[in-house]
């Protein structure tokens, strides 16, 4: 083995298998791009993004860790969200929850 070498198993890796998901259509109504990271509580994203915010409470983007989705001004797209796991307690972000979901 070489230091840092990865030895992946054969086959596909399914992210967030078995976790609840929801699909929302998001429109950037602002005049600047908005980029959202993989683990940001989607309910609390920039107010320039228009979507069913209540449907996104307790969810984040269903994308690989460390990645992000960028919404250009005027752009509309559909994204899949996945439920936050663990204790489901949210602090920080935009300060809209600050406790248990």
Swiss-Prot record:
One of its GO terms (molecular function) is urease activity. One of its GO terms (cellular component) is urease complex. The keyword Disulfide bond does not apply. It is found in: Cytoplasm. Disulfide bonds: none annotated. It comes from Ralstonia pickettii (strain 12J). This is Urease subunit beta. The gene is ureB. Its main location: cytoplasm. It catalyses: urea + 2 H2O + H(+) = hydrogencarbonate + 2 NH4(+). InterPro entries: Urease_beta-like (IPR002019), Urease_betasu_sf (IPR036461), Urease_subunit (IPR050069). SUPFAM superfamilies: Urease, beta-subunit (SSF51278).
């Amino acid at each position: 083995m070489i230091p840092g070498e990865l030895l992946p198993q054969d086959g596909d890796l399914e992210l967030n298998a078995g976790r609840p998901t929801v699909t929302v259509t998001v429109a950037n109504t602002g005049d600047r791009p908005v980029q959202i990271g993989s683990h940001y509580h989607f309910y609390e994203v920039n107010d320039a993004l228009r979507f069913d915010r209540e449907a996104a409470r307790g969810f984040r983007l269903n994308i690989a860790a460390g990645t992000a989705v960028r919404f250009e001004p005027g752009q509309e797209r559909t994204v899949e969200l996945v439920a936050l796991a663990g204790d489901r307690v949210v602090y920080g972000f935009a300060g809209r929850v600050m406790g248990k979901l």
